[in-house]
Swiss-Prot record:
Active site: 134
Enzyme class: transferase
UniProt record similarity statement: Belongs to the class I-like SAM-binding methyltransferase superfamily. TrmB family.
Protein name from the UniProt record: tRNA (guanine-N(7)-)-methyltransferase
Keywords: Methyltransferase, S-adenosyl-L-methionine, Transferase, tRNA processing
UniProt key word Cell division: no
Species in which this protein is naturally found: Maricaulis maris (strain MCS10) (Caulobacter maris)
Binding site for S-adenosyl-L-methionine: 60, 85, 112, 134
Keyword Transferase: yes
Pfam families on file: Methyltransf_4
Length: 228
């Protein structure tokens, strides 16, 4: 397991991959702990084989500092969680929390998820979380948004029938973008029946400090889709 984000010329990673220097403890966790709980450097990825004693498998794309990922793993010990995040400081924070909690049901990758998702086995996940991704407000940057046809196809391939995709955002244009991308795809069924279903956090949602900062232009929107 490498500690550098994967480099594929077909993809360009937008935004920073590292902020301030890591502390000595964080660097030690990146050097020593990350290889132990990391994903394989190459070849297919089978989440069930990585964590065979877990009943379900979930993925969080862009986990930031790992607050949601770690809390979900603590609350759901029978689920194996995989987190993918390119930002080194976020990975280091997540490693610190995982180590402190002694969690055995989390695996991490410091990578661009667009590069690593094709390596996952088909129908290998029960749930995918994409929470408050970079909205790329400017129209000329719209193609940088994570939710595109190519990633939608990957979501459909990776989720088991009956699996769930949850996207959350506090940016109206991004919510509209996601609905356009997914609502017309007959592989997914939007689960909202009333306004409360998408304007209130789902019962199993874990609110993070980032979410409470209200950095977007609307209240948080939660879009849950069922894989048919």
């Amino acid at each position: 397991m490498t500690t550098e984000p994967t480099q594929n010329p077909a993809f360009r990673l937008f935004g920073r991959s590292q902020g301030k220097p890591l502390s000595a403890r964080q660097q030690r966790l990146v050097d020593e702990f990350l290889p132990r709980i990391g994903l394989p450097d190459d070849g297919p990825i089978d989440p069930a084989a990585l964590m065979p004693d877990r009943r379900r498998q979930a993925l969080e794309i862009g986990f930031g500092g790992g607050e949601h990922l770690v809390a979900q793993a603590e609350a759901n010990p029978q689920t194996g969680f995989i987190g993918i995040e390119p930002f080194l400081n976020g990975v280091a924070k997540a490693l610190t929390a995982i180590d402190a909690a002694g969690l055995g049901n989390v695996r991490l990758a410091r990578a661009d998820a667009r590069e690593i998702l094709p390596r996952f086995e088909t129908a290998s996940l029960d749930q995918i979380f994409l929470l408050f991704p970079d909205p790329w407000h400017k129209k000329r940057h719209a193609k940088r948004r994570f939710v595109q046809q190519s990633t939608r196809d990957e979501f459909a391939r990776l989720l088991k029938p009956g699996g769930r995709l949850r996207i959350a955002t506090d940016v109206k244009s991004y919510a509209d973008h996601c609905m356009v991308e997914l609502s017309g795809d007959d592989r997914f069924i939007w689960q909202a029946r009333t306004a409360d279903d998408w304007t209130l956090p789902p019962a199993d949602h874990i609110t993070t400090r980032y979410e409470t900062k209200n950095l977007g232009d609307c209240a948080p929107v939660f879009m849950d889709f069922l894989r048919v």
